[in-house]
Amino acid sequence: MRKVLITGTGGNLGGKLVHTFAKVPWCEKVVAVARPSSFADGRFANIEKVEPLPLELTSASDGEIGEAVALADTIVHFAVVNALPDATWEEAASSFMMTSRLLFAARDRGLKRFVFASSNHAVGALKEVHETLAPGSLTAERVAPGTHWETLDGCMIGYGYGSAKIFTERMCVAAAQRDGLSTVSIRIGWCQVGENLPHTLNAGGNPKLSADKQESKSSNSDLRWFRNMWLSNRDFDNLFERAVLADAANWPQPGIVINGVSANSGMAWEIETAKQLIGYRPQDDVWS
């Protein structure tokens, strides 16, 4: 039985995972961490096995973080200061510092698994050349931050957000070299709010983009890039369940980085490593 602390549960992905883990038999307790304002609507209040924990991780004391970590044996970390790729360098640096404090608190208190929600934006600059990438060639060893995407104010480049994800991946790998901690950093593709259907993916890669702007500013090439990184809801569930439960004994090292997308036909993303190392079994294809 596992006790799992999930951060960022006021957001899309963290909220999804709370509901998923609350239903699985192997999870004894879910500690749902979010900013205090996120619990104003009473979320998770009546869900069996879920313990809501209002905590602002960016300003919490070391003692408060330590007390939170002590409630679980596993951490799944989604929380960021700004969850969109338009994050400033200051916001990205604050997210990195928050994660480092949580990660090392977990290691110092003897937790066995830390799962970090990294992002496709770690290689976002490859969107501009993705048509040249062979299927399955985009491994999690590649780094190329700087997604170009359209906003209502024009084109922006997400250097800070993607760079912070890369640095945190490396920190997780380094932290796992001692004291029995194992880490899994997952470069999550695109898993939308709610039903998360393929036909609602847009070519701008930005949920704030208007329909008119999508039509006038986005290319078919951009649409293929974003659709090929789709992660369905049930594949998301399987991916994170396996990231928590997989035995690290046969990994090449105790800290690993993997891609997290569905089995989308013809995509550049490589997911064989995720299948082999954690037993990921995707069932969906954006093109089917």
Indicate residue ranges for each PLM-predicted region.
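Alpha-helical substrate-binding/gating segment
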Residues: 173, 191-194, 199-221, 230-254
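N-terminal Rossmann NAD(P)H-binding glycine-rich loop of SDR-like oxidoreductase domains
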Residues: 4-26
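Conserved C-terminal active-site "lid" loop/helix of NAD(P)H-dependent oxidoreductases
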Residues: 254-281
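Conserved Rossmann-fold NAD(P)-dependent oxidoreductase catalytic core, especially the SDR/UDP-sugar
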Residues: 101-158
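Conserved beta-loop-beta element that borders a ligand/cofactor-binding pocket
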Residues: 159, 168-194
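NAD(P)H-binding glycine-rich loop region in Rossmannoid oxidoreductase-like domains
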Residues: 49-97
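Active-site YXXXK catalytic motif of short-chain dehydrogenase/reductase
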Residues: 95, 157, 161, 165
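Conserved glycine-rich Rossmann-like NAD(P)H-binding loop of the short-chain dehydrogenase/reductase
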Residues: 25-40
